[in-house]
Amino acid sequence: MNLEDIRDNPGARKKRMRVGRGIGSGKGKTAGRGVKGQKARTGVAIKGFEGGQMPLHRRLPKRGFHNIFRLDYNEVSLGKIQAAVEAGKLDAGQPVTEAALVAAGVLRRAKDGVRVLGTGELSAKVTLEVAYATKSAVAAVEKAGGSVTVLAAPAVAEAE
């Protein structure tokens, strides 16, 4: 057997049908699109349209809602605070607030407050002024000789 003897299996490579090239081709005139109607026209069909059948997005029930008063908190671990203190980005003598964490590069941007999580080790004596702290975080800060002040949540304006 030589290289020139190798052939594709019969029907393995089928030529593509060129549509709309005259009635003699077998796919001329309407080019396999049938006659008139929306599907015969150019352009994309309506997304989600299922030919008059109730579309999937309307068959499924509505669920949930979007709470416009939901607060978005930054979460920071004690390990990250300790790393920032060790790197000299945070001053352990000053209160650790959201603004201080943003300035130190621990957080990207200020949101509705900071939630301190108890993961990681903390040995620095720090004073935290945050919106929320877990029980384990408060215990770890107080064990290191620091303190935690939980700030009041921002007031939500009453709808009139």
Swiss-Prot record:
Residues 21-35 have a biased composition (Gly residues). Transmembrane segments: none annotated. Keywords: Ribonucleoprotein, Ribosomal protein, RNA-binding, rRNA-binding. GO terms for molecular function: rRNA binding; structural constituent of ribosome. One of its GO terms (biological process) is translation. Residues 1-37 are annotated as: Disordered. Residues 1-11 have a biased composition (Basic and acidic residues). The keyword Ribosomal protein applies. The keyword RNA-binding applies. GO terms for cellular component: cytosolic large ribosomal subunit. Binds to the 23S rRNA. Belongs to the universal ribosomal protein uL15 family. This is Large ribosomal subunit protein uL15. It comes from Xanthobacter autotrophicus (strain ATCC BAA-1158 / Py2).
